[in-house]
Amino acid sequence: MDISTITSYIENLVNTPSPTGFTKLAEKYLIDEFEKLGYAPYQNNKGNVIVPINEMEGANGLLLSAHVDTLGLMVRSIKSNGALRVTTLGGFPLNFVEFENVKIYTRSGKEYTGVVRLNNPAVHGSDAPREAKRNDETMEVVIDAITHSKEETEKLGIRNGDFISLDPRFRIDNGFIKSRHLDDKASAGVLLALAKEIKEKNIKINRPLYMMFTIYEEVGHGASAGHPAGISDMVAVDMGVVHEDLTCDELKVSICAKDSSGPYNYDLTNDLVEIAEDLKLDYGLDIYPFYGSDASAAVASDYDYRHALVGCGVAASHGYERTHEKAIKSLFDLLVNLVKK
């Protein structure tokens, strides 16, 4: 498959706002795209999008998962100056979103743009830009509307609990894909491309195969319930960690041996390693010191699965992230061969 097909899916997903808890647009995008490919996606009560790729009798099914919820913000309170105090959706330091453009979604359906910044952001006014801690007391969202008071902001329809998405700033330069939310929309785009490849090339699959796109992974319970029946193996497709003492980088596919939840299934992880070596893929086998996946959430919720974790190497996780087309293509090739196995 041409890499541009995969990156187009990734770009479309990245540009579809879906902070965790506010993912309706991404859910609709997935459903529409899978229906175009001739599949019959459905949603469980939680809202995860589940796609039967190869339905057949048997209890040895394979479930591939990715998540489409992303980091974001929520209005904690409206300040006396009309700006917004915020709380984070997912785990990241607020300095990772300093000076980022945002969009605020009211519960009545209105949308406003704004920017995240320090309460006192002018370098010509104080030492705050150099010295201030970055937290929810020292930073705020200023709205692109004329408001100088809590009352004026309330008249806009903005209230506590409104969701806020971050501008992803997607771009590709010399093969490097740079954007927010590559965790995990890069993986979701790869799975969409995989489903397209299976359908268009009539790839023979010898076991039940499902895909699941979760919407609460960033807060820990994305794959905790509502799975299709007959699954024995689950592979979470999620970003690979790039760090100074790990083997993965932005050009590689990453296979995880252990994360914060403990080790992944030995045999299923070895299957991924064997495929990567047979294909002569550039890959890394690593532990992720601060990480949890949908697969680990599933086994912690008493699903009797062998579980594994694989993804493209993503640098600067939970910030302005970067991977490379080579890593995306390697991940795609690994998954094509996994479903044939």
Feature names for model-found ranges:
Residues M1-K341:
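N-terminal hydrophobic/helix-forming segments and targeting peptides
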